[in-house]
UniProtKB/Swiss-Prot annotation:
Pfam families: LGT (PF01790). It comes from Clostridium tetani (strain Massachusetts / E88). Catalyzes the transfer of the diacylglyceryl group from phosphatidylglycerol to the sulfhydryl group of the N-terminal cysteine of a prolipoprotein, the first step in the formation of mature lipoproteins. Pathway: Protein modification; lipoprotein biosynthesis (diacylglyceryl transfer). It comes from the Bacteria. A 1,2-diacyl-sn-glycero-3-phospho-(1'-sn-glycerol) binds at residue 129. This is Phosphatidylglycerol--prolipoprotein diacylglyceryl transferase.
C-alpha cells in the first residue's frame, strides 16, 4: 500500500488519484485512436468522453450515497470529503447514460458507439483498481494463501492481516477483458456484441470477486449491491447480444 506516491513542490500526489487519472488518459487515447479509424470527428469524441467522465463521476457518487445512506445520515460530514466514497457500477451506469444522451444528440448509432467505448472503460478500470490497491480500499477477506497481502496503517484495510488482494485480481481481470474486447471488436459483425460481452463478462467476474471482498459495503439480501446489479447487467447483456434474434421473433 502506498497512498502517497511522492511529493512535488510540497503537493502530495496520491496513488489512487494518479491511477484514476492515468486510467482516464489511457482510455481517452485508445478511444481517440479507434474512433478516427471509424471516421468520427475527434472533437466530438473528446466532448463525448468529457460528458461520459462527468456522468461517471456523478453516477459513482450517487450510488455510493444510495448504498451507504444510513451511515451518511448518521455521519453527514462524510460527504465533505469529495474523494471518499465511489461505487464503480454507479460510474458505469452514469457514464453509459451520458454517452447514450450524447449519441442521441449527434444521431449516432448508440450500440455502435458503446461497442467503441467499452474497451476503453475496461482499460480505465484496470488502472483504477491499482489505485484501490495503493490506497488500501476494496480489500479482500483474510487468507492463508501465499498470494495474501498485508496492509499497515491503512485508513481502510485492517492492519497486519494477510488478505486476498482483490484489487489486483480485479485489475488483472479488467486488463484482460479490455484486450479481449479489442480482439473481438475486429471480428464482431453486429452492433452491440462488444458492449454486451463487456457487461456479461464483467458482471460474472464481479460476482466472483465480490465473494472474496472483505470491506464493508451495501447488500441486498445475501448478495452485495454489486452482485445484485451484476445479475441485471448480465441479463441485459444476453438480451443485447441476441437482440436481432428477438427482433425476428
Amino acid at each position: 500500500m502506498k497512498p502517497v506516491l511522492f511529493e512535488l513542490f510540497g503537493l502530495k500526489i496520491y496513488g489512487y488519484g494518479a491511477m484514476i487519472a492515468l486510467g482516464i488518459l489511457a482510455a481517452v487515447i485508445l478511444l481517440d485512436k479507434r474512433s478516427k479509424k471509424r471516421g468520427y470527428n475527434e472533437d466530438h469524441i473528446f466532448n463525448m468522453a468529457i460528458v461520459g467522465i462527468i456522468g461517471g463521476i456523478l453516477g459513482g457518487k450517487l450510488l455510493y450515497i444510495i448504498v451507504d445512506i444510513k451511515n451518511i445520515i448518521d455521519n453527514p460530514e462524510i460527504l465533505k470529503d469529495l474523494g471518499n466514497g465511489f461505487v464503480i457500477y454507479g460510474a458505469i451506469i452514469g457514464g453509459a447514460i451520458s454517452v447514450y444522451l450524447y449519441c442521441k444528440k449527434k444521431n449516432w448509432d448508440v450500440l455502435k458507439m458503446l461497442d467503441l467505448v467499452v474497451p476503453s472503460v475496461a482499460l480505465a478500470q484496470g488502472f483504477g483498481r491499482i489505485g484501490c490497491f495503493l490506497a488500501g480500499c476494496c480489500y479482500g477477506k483474510p487468507t492463508k494463501l501465499p498470494i495474501g497481502v498485508m496492509f499497515t496503517n491503512s485508513p481502510f484495510a485492517p492492519s497486519n492481516i494477510h488478505l486476498h488482494p482483490t484489487q489486483i485480481y480485479s485489475s488483472i481481470f479488467d486488463f484482460l477483458l479490455a484486450f479481449f474486447l479489442l480482439w473481438y471488436s475486429r471480428k464482431a459483425e453486429k452492433s452491440g456484441r462488444v458492449f454486451s460481452l463487456y457487461v456479461i463478462i464483467y458482471g460474472v467476474g464481479r460476482v466472483i470477486v465480490e465473494f472474496l471482498r472483505g470491506d464493508p459495503r451495501g447488500n441486498v439480501s445475501m448478495l452485495s449491491t454489486s452482485q445484485f446489479i451484476s445479475l441485471f447487467t448480465i441479463i441485459i447483456g444476453i438480451f443485447v447480444f441476441n437482440i436481432d434474434r428477438f427482433r425476428k421473433q
